C-alpha cells in the first residue's frame, strides 16, 4: 500500500445514519495528511445484494466487501473501523429481502421449507447472512476492551441513574441443574493437524454424517456438549409454575442473534411450553399456515391474519386464556402488548440482564410498571455470573457510578474461538442415538448419547489465539499495574484444557510483581465486585462468550452504556480492527428519527475508535500527522463530554448531528492551537475561525431540521441522496468543510 488506508464500514440502522454526517468530517480532516479513508459496505442489505449477483442487473451488483475485509484482516496493512451491524434474525432477514424486492432487486424469497435443490441453495446462502455473520470474519485477533479515562471521569462527574435495590427483592436467575451444555461437556486436545468427522449413529445402527470435515490444527482444543430437549422442557415447566407461585414476572434471556442455530430452538421450546394449551388445541391449523415456534409468538400473530376472522378471534382468545393461567411475562413494549416471547431477537442476554440489574432487578410488566423478575437462562455455563451480581446488589445495594471501579476485558475470540464459532457444528438431532467425533484414522475423540430433538454442538479453540490472548493479558496487567483474572471453570471439560495451556504459556513471561489468577466465573465475579465497590479496577481475561457479556455488564453499570467503550482488536498479523463500542445498532433511534427528525445515536464510540485507528496508522506508517490528528481528536472528544455536547433524547435538544458539529469545531480548534505540525496548524486556523464564528448559525440550522417526519425511502437500504440531505441539513456547516474536501 502506498497511501495508508483506513477502511470505515457502512453498517445498519442508527450508526449507518450517523455515518452520513460523520464520514464527511473525517475525510475533510484527514485528507491533507496522506491518509485515504475508504468505505466498505457490510450492511445487511449490502450483504444480501452481494450474495445473489445472478438475480440482479449489472448496475445493481456490488462486490462482496465482507469477504474482502476478511482477507485484509489477515494482513499487516489492515486498519478497519467497524461500526455495529444487524445480526439478523429470520424476521429481520425477511423484512430486508422484502424491502430490496420493492426497490427493484429481484432477490429470491427466503424459503422456510426448501423442497427443490435451488431452494435449498438459496436458503443455505441466506442462512450464512443470518445471525452474527460479520464479526467472526473480521476478528482475526483477540479483544482489548476498556473505558477510556475521559469517559470514566465524565461518568464519575455525571453519574447515570441506577435503580435502588431492596434486600427482599424476589428477582433471581433460574438455570438448569442437569441436561444442559455445561453438564454434558467433553473435550479433547488435537495432536496432529488434519480434520474430524461428526456423525450420528442412530439406535437402529444407521449412520448420518452431520459434518464430513472440520479442519483442526495441532494443539487445538475441541469440545462437544448436548442440551437435552426433555430436560429443558421439564425445567421450563417447573420455572413457569415457580414464577406464578412467587408472583414474579417470567423472562427469558438468550442470544438468538449470535447463537443462531441453538438459541432459536431453545426459545421455541420455551414458547411451546408457555403457550402449550393454545398451541396444542390449534396445532393442525397452525401447521397449515406455517407457524414456527422458533420465531416466537409474534410469528403466530403475523400468520393467523390469513385465516377467517372467526378463527383468528378464537386463537387470540385462547392465547389470552393462557395469559390468565400463566405468570405475567416481562414485556418488550407493554403499550403494544409485545412480550419477551414475541420475537427471539428482542431480548438479548448481554444487554437485557445488565438493564434489569440497573433497574433494581426489575423488568417491565404488562401493566407498564417495573416488577421483580425470574430471569431464565437455561444453560449453566455463565448464568451464575448474573446471579452473583443480583445477590451482591441485594446485600450491598446498587453500584455507585461516582466511585465504582472498572473491569476492562481481554477476550479470546480470534479464529472463531469457542461457542461463537460453533454454528456450523450445531445440530438439532433427528433420532435417538450417539454422536461421535472421529479423526481421519477413525480414532474416537468425543462421544455423546443424544435423543431426538436435543441440540448437539462442537466448539473449537486454536492454540495460536490462546497464546496471543495470554500475551495480551500479561501486557495489559503490566501496562496498567492491575490484577488480571482468567475466568475459567476447572469443572468444565473445555476450561480445564484451557487452564493447562494458560498455566504453561504464563511461564513464557516475566510476571514478577503482577497479580494474575485463575478463578471460576462465579468466584471471579465475586472477586471483581468486591474490588469494584472499593473503587479498584480488575482485568477480566475471558473466553469469547464472557468477553461479550462482561463488556456489556460492567460498562452499563459504570457508564450507563456499553457504546462508550474503547474496543480494539490487535490483529494477529499486525493490523488493527477498531470496533466502535460494544452496543447494538439501536433500531429505536431510527424509529425516532423517521418520526420526528431527531437522531439520538451517540457517536462517542466512533470518535474513540477513530483516534485509536489514527494512532495505529501513525505508528505503523511513521506518519506524524496522523499522531497529531489522533491526539487533537482525543482533546476534542474530552471537550464534548466536559461541555455536555453529546446527543440528548428529545426534539429541541442537541442530537447526533449537533454533536458532530461540535466535534469538528473542537477538533479544528485543537489543531489550530497545537504547534507540533505547522502545516496542520495553518490549514485549520481558518477552518476553526469559520466554525467558531458561525456556531450559532450552524446550531440553528441543525435544530431547524428537527421536529418533522423524515422520508429516506428505506430502512435497511435507504436512498443515499435523501439520507445525506436529511442528515446534513446545515448549508453553512457543509460550506465550512468544503475547502478541506
Curated annotation (Swiss-Prot):
SUPFAM superfamilies xref list: Isocitrate/Isopropylmalate dehydrogenase-like
- Enzyme Commission code: 1.1.1.42
Q: Where, subcellularly, is it found?
A: Cytoplasm
Q: Does the keyword Metal-binding apply?
A: yes
Binding residues for NADP(+): 85, 87, 135, 585, 589, 600, 602, 649
Please name the GO terms of the biological process aspect recorded for this protein, alphabetically.
glyoxylate cycle; tricarboxylic acid cycle
Cofactor note, please?
A: Binds 1 Mg(2+) or Mn(2+) ion per subunit.
Transmembrane residues, as ranges? none
The record's comment about this protein's domains reads:
Consists of two distinct domains, a small domain (domain I) and a large domain (domain II). The structure of the large domain repeats a motif observed in the dimeric IDH. Such a fusional structure by domain duplication enables a single polypeptide chain to form a structure at the catalytic site that is homologous to the dimeric IDH, the catalytic site of which is located at the interface of two identical subunits.
Quaternary state and partners of this protein? Monomer.
Supply the name of the protein: Isocitrate dehydrogenase [NADP]
Amino acid at each position: 500500500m502506498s497511501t495508508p488506508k483506513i477502511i470505515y464500514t457502512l453498517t445498519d440502522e442508527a450508526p449507518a445514519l450517523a455515518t452520513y454526517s460523520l464520514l464527511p468530517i473525517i475525510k475533510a480532516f484527514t485528507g491533507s495528511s496522506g491518509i485515504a479513508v475508504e468505505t466498505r459496505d457490510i450492511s445487511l442489505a449490502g450483504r444480501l445484494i452481494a450474495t445473489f449477483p445472478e438475480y440482479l442487473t449489472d448496475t445493481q451488483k456490488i462486490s462482496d466487501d465482507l469477504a474482502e475485509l476478511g482477507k485484509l484482516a489477515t494482513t499487516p496493512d489492515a486498519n478497519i473501523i467497524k461500526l455495529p451491524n444487524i445480526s439478523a434474525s429470520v424476521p429481520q432477514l425477511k423484512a430486508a429481502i422484502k424491502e430490496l424486492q420493492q426497490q427493484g432487486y429481484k432477490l429470491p424469497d427466503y424459503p422456510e421449507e426448501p423442497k427443490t435443490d435451488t431452494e435449498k441453495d438459496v436458503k443455505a446462502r441466506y442462512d450464512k447472512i443470518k445471525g452474527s455473520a460479520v464479526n467472526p470474519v473480521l476478528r482475526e485477533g483477540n479483544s482489548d476492551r476498556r473505558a477510556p479515562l475521559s469517559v470514566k471521569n465524565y461518568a464519575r462527574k455525571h453519574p447515570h441513574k441506577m435503580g435502588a435495590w431492596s434486600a427482599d427483592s424476589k428477582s433471581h436467575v433460574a438455570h438448569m441443574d442437569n441436561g444442559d451444555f455445561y453438564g454434558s461437556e467433553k473435550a479433547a486436545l488435537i495432536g496432529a493437524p488434519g480434520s474430524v468427522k461428526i456423525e450420528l449413529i442412530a439406535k437402529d445402527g444407521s449412520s448420518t454424517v452431520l459434518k464430513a470435515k472440520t479442519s483442526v490444527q495441532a494443539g487445538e482444543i475441541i469440545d462437544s456438549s448436548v442440551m437435552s430437549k426433555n430436560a429443558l422442557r421439564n425445567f421450563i415447566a417447573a420455572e413457569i409454575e415457580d414464577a406464578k407461585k412467587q408472583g414474579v414476572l417470567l423472562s427469558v434471556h438468550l442470544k438468538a442473534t449470535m447463537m443462531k442455530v441453538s438459541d432459536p430452538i431453545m426459545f421455541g421450546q420455551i414458547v411451546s411450553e408457555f403457550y402449550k394449551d393454545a398451541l396444542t388445541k390449534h396445532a393442525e391449523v397452525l401447521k397449515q399456515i406455517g407457524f414456527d415456534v422458533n420465531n416466537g409468538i409474534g410469528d403466530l400473530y403475523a400468520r393467523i391474519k390469513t385465516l377467517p376472522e372467526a378463527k383468528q378471534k378464537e386463537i387470540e382468545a385462547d392465547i389470552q386464556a393462557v395469559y390468565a393461567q400463566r405468570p405475567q411475562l416481562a414485556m418488550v413494549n407493554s403499550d403494544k402488548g409485545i412480550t419477551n416471547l414475541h420475537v427471539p431477537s428482542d431480548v438479548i442476554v448481554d444487554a437485557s440482564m445488565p438493564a434489569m440489574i440497573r433497574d433494581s432487578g426489575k423488568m417491565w410488566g404488562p401493566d407498564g410498571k417495573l416488577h421483580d423478575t425470574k430471569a431464565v437462562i437455561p444453560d449453566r455455563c455463565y448464568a451464575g455470573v448474573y446471579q452473583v451480581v443480583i445477590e451482591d446488589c441485594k446485600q450491598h445495594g446498587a453500584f455507585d457510578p461516582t466511585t465504582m471501579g472498572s473491569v476492562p476485558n481481554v477476550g479470546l475470540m480470534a479464529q472463531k474461538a469457542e461457542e461463537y464459532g460453533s454454528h456450523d457444528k450445531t445440530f438439532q438431532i433427528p433420532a435417538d442415538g450417539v454422536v461421535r467425533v472421529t479423526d481421519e484414522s477413525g480414532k474416537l475423540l468425543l462421544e455423546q448419547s443424544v435423543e431426538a430433538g436435543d441440540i448437539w454442538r462442537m466448539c473449537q479453540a486454536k492454540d495460536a489465539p490462546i497464546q496471543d490472548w495470554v500475551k495480551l493479558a500479561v501486557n495489559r496487567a503490566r501496562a496498567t499495574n492491575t490484577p488480571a483474572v482468567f475466568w475459567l471453570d476447572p469443572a468444565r471439560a473445555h476450561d480445564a484444557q484451557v487452564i493447562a495451556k494458560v498455566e504453561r504459556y504464563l511461564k513464557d513471561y516475566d510476571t514478577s510483581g503482577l497479580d494474575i489468577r485463575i478463578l471460576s466465573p462465579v468466584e471471579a465475579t465475586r472477586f471483581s465486585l468486591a474490588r469494584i465497590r472499593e473503587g479498584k479496577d480488575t482485568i477480566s481475561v475471558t473466553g469469547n462468550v464472557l468477553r461479550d457479556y462482561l463488556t456489556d455488564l460492567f460498562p452499563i453499570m459504570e457508564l450507563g452504556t456499553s457504546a462508550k467503550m474503547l474496543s480494539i482488536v490487535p490483529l494477529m498479523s499486525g493490523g488493527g480492527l477498531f470496533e466502535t463500542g460494544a452496543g447494538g445498532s439501536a433500531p429505536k433511534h431510527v424509529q425516532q428519527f423517521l418520526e420526528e427528525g431527531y437522531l439520538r445515536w451517540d457517536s462517542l464510540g466512533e470518535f474513540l475508535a477513530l483516534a485509536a485507528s489514527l494512532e495505529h496508522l501513525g505508528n505503523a506508517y511513521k506518519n506524524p500527522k496522523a499522531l497529531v490528528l489522533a491526539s487533537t481528536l482525543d482533546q476534542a472528544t474530552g471537550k464534548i463530554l466536559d461541555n455536555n455536547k453529546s446527543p440528548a433524547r428529545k426534539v429541541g435538544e442537541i442530537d447526533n448531528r449537533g454533536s458532530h458539529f461540535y466535534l469538528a469545531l473542537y477538533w479544528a480548534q485543537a489543531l489550530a492551537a497545537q504547534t507540533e505540525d505547522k502545516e496542520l496548524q495553518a490549514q485549520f486556523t481558518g477552518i476553526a475561525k469559520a466554525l467558531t464564528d458561525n456556531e450559532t448559525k450552524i446550531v440553528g440550522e441543525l435544530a431547524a431540521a428537527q421536529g418533522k417526519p423524515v422520508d429516506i425511502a428505506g430502512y435497511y437500504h435507504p436512498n443515499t441522496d435523501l439520507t445525506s440531505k436529511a442528515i446534513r441539513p446545515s448549508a453553512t456547516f457543509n460550506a465550512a468543510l468544503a475547502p478541506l474536501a
